Amino acid sequence: MKNLYVGLMSGTSRDSLDGCLVSFEKGLSVLACETLSFSEGYQTSQDQAFIDREITIKSIELVNKLIETERQNVVAIAFPGQTISHNDDFSLQAGSPEIIAKQTKIPVYSDFRNFDIANGGKGAPLIPAFHKYLLSEKGTEKLVLNIGGICNGTYLKDENIVHSSDIGPGNCLLDATMRNFNLGKFDLDGALASKGNIDSFLLEELLSQIESLPYPRADDLSVYMSLIEKNKKAFDEKAPEDILCTFTELTVKKIQEYFNFCGAPETVVFHGGGAENKYLMHRIKETIKAEISTIDSVISSKYVESAAFAYLAFKERAVLFK
């Protein structure tokens, strides 16, 4: 019998639900990957009952797709839920692991963030353990950066995690700007941002408003989304491409700051939606002097986080629901 795990993930951007079917018996083996879109309005909804229902129903649908021919070999499902709010001592996720377990007849690991907090962690980022499992090796130093809605990093030296933290906004401000101007859900390849100009004065103001955040930390999305409201007057006077260009540079600066904090390691590996933003990656490569690559040679960047939660379920680092 195979020992398979299903990992699910909907990030802070809420753009889709990703899932993968994996095995850890002889290193990581990815058997299947799928993505489902959410119903209209999910991305910006404040209705927790709607969010609860949607993430639960879509998760059941996605699990059933992934395990169609392997159901008897699945040990557990990793369901992190949809983060509603997060701070260092409590995390709130939407979704029902109990219903998923009952409907699929498969045990579900969930409440990963509060489990981590209860065991001395900050509840985020949770992916460093998977970074270590996947990428650490003797005689190397690597910085692994996940650019999701929020950007987080893991600094690996030899086979150890030296440091990990949330470090700044990833795609969240870019996606919000696109929505606010009715330009779509995201800026494909950073094409619109690449046509804009950086507002240096505004960039320095944005940096000053979040410069006091310490490492290590776990950031709630509201920390960065509040920048839009705080600086509304300045944004009202600017073209969307200039706002996008300036927000892109904000992400670049926060990545550079953490890169320097970690001692400027020679190798930097990226994954997450931001790694597919050509303009953002172009600016990162111009700013950071390191060997830069993406994780895609090991696993598709899009499914790293869902595989990471499957790994945490495999290691039993969550609450089990049957």
Predicted regions and their residues:
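Glycine-rich beta-strand-to-loop/alpha-helix junction loops that act as flexible
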Residues: 10, 79-82, 147-149, 266-276, ...
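Glycine-rich phosphate-binding/hydrolytic loop that grips phosphoryl groups
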Residues: 10-14, 245, 249, 296-322
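Non-transmembrane, aqueous-exposed alpha-helical and coiled segments at domain scale
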Residues: 68-73, 243, 258, 262, ...
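A contiguous, well-structured pocket-lining segment that forms one wall/lid of small-molecule binding clefts
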Residues: 184-267, 277-289
